[in-house]
Amino acid sequence: MREDIRKIVLIVLEVILAPFVFISAIILKIFRKLGPRRLPKNTKLLKIIGIYPLRDHYYEPQFKYDTFDEDASKNRVLCGLDLRPDHQIRLLNEMNYQDDFENFLSDQNKKESDLAFNFDNGMINTGDAEFLYNYIRHLKPSKVIEIGCGSSTKIISSALRTNNKNSEHICIEPYEQKWLEKMSDIKVYRTPLEKVKSDVFDILEENDLLFIDSSHIIRPQGDVLKEYLEIIPALSKGVHIHVHDIFTPNDYPKSWLDEHMLFWNEQYILEALLTNTNTYEIVAALNFLKNNYYSEFKK
């Protein structure tokens, strides 16, 4: 009933807003035609409000995907990128902690609501969650650093405790998840990654884990560039890196780009880093496994 009311409200809002959006779009198109330098006060006003119009132009981020290939199972041609499928399947067969993960799920009703993990979290869903838990159990890291935290933090924290090692868990989360401070077994940095000193990552050693789930967007002097050009190249040999929301060898899902209007591009700098390299190797590409080796992945 509540969902039906919500749908009706959204339909009414669409009808009411449509003429205003149309008129605003015409005005903003004129603004972009004249250019922000010619209209500095209007440009400043848009920055204060926190919104800026994009044009359908080859110099700007893409937001129209009329010709986008929707075949999610179609692998892109990525010359020089070794996905190592045999190694990935071997890893899946070696990880056998699903019973412990089920115990982790059953324990969630004993926790405060904001500290409990559930699959209806909008961040890390089935498949990703099971793999992350199993991988932490399998890897048994002494130290984990998360860049971007949330439901993954709950999974990692539980897996580390079950490993029964004196592990260190550091979370870098400047924007969200106010409940992090309630978790006594983690150290929280409430600082944008761009301002975190890179020597924080010097503690990571062989078989430790760096988990990345940050802005997903390449920006000048932004977090993604710091991760891939400053932090990752300086890591000690044998450190494992888990990057969330990667769909290699496919593109990002069309619904994410066309419906949710996400401008994410992190995946492509990661693919460039992994192309024709002996420095890094792919351990697991979950979207690839799901689309090409589903029976092995499902186990």
Give the location of each predicted region:
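A short alpha-helical cap/connector motif
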Residues: R2-T162, N166-H242, I246-K299
